[in-house]
């Protein structure tokens, strides 16, 4: 039986986040590189109408929340760093529920690392949710940015620095609380 892996490049790099969605300990998260792609905050979520709405302390609800995305085309700063998480087809179905604004794509030939699964997939923003330029009133949730950076720091020396060097923050990071929760089981509620 061939092994299946997920290339995680954002919040799934955080062990706790991956484990929550998989419904089991995620196991070893092995650092790898995704070549011929770049990472950006280019996935947008309509904060006012989606399954989770966040509100800032002042009562302001930003219209758009940005999340990380990978796009084809490598940056001068180098390939996208991330992790490979081994999983089953059933677990991949759970990830599809979590990654509702993303399409699953095969990146097997673009991932470099040791002892890789025979098939590796990742998620890239669906056309409707892809924002090459941040919409007006877009923000990044501070809890999301901190979770991602915590995950990369835990991977070991140089991983957080590489993330920061290859991933610009295009808009403000804000503190916000979840005020509307229609989130499917296994999905993070902090972002």
Segments from the language model and where they lie:
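A glycine-rich, hydrophobic/aromatic-adjacent loop/helix-cap motif
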Residues: 1-191
